[in-house]
């Protein structure tokens, strides 16, 4: 044991510790719905994890933004000194919408992002600022990306401006790279990230199958991913 402690002391930092000393308490954010809680955590009294990535996928008008805002409201209500960074790619968040959902607008920052690179940069900088704050001065924080499917890439925009009719093959790798950088940082900071995403029909599947857009990047790092059905498919 002394040997292990010496290793931790020499090669570790504040996030390196013996497994027995790791805080094993699983914490959740109530989604505002017992059914939704049970779907994402296995308990009606649970919810989404407080330090992991949760993906909410579905077709248009299936309630992705609705559930995301419900989670934001419950998070802010539970943490009176907490705040939320809402990365909006659809210009869907308005003062009227927030007021109708009872969300404290003074504790929510709406960040408009157009490209994956822009989201990656702004999210990483925000987490870095949070981690540099003294731990006792850190207030509860959560991130929302709504939605991943609407993010473009710098290459796609450049090609469009130059009237190049070519397919952008870089998006999947950019998505994977962005979440590869963010996953551990968010975990260290205890910042939950809710990501909404679009789905598409898998061509050639034996049974009707839905898949999230953007490649496997989000699917491989999300602690929980939930696909919302359309009314006619229920």
What are these regions (language model features)?
Residues 225-234:
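Single conserved hydrophobic/aromatic residue that forms the stacking wall/gate
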Residues 109-113:
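Short acidic-hydrophobic, aromatic-tinged amphipathic segments that line or gate anion-handling sites
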Residues 91-92, 116, 193, 201, ...:
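Alpha-helix N-cap/helix-start and coil->helix boundary motif
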Residues 2-108, 119-128, 132:
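The Walker A/P-loop phosphate-binding site
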Residues 39, 154, 234:
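Residues that scaffold the ATP/ADP-binding catalytic core of kinase and kinase-like folds
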Residues 29, 65, 116, 172-176, ...:
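A conditional alpha-helix N-cap/helix-loop micro-motif detector
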Residues 122-220, 226:
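P-loop NTPase motor core
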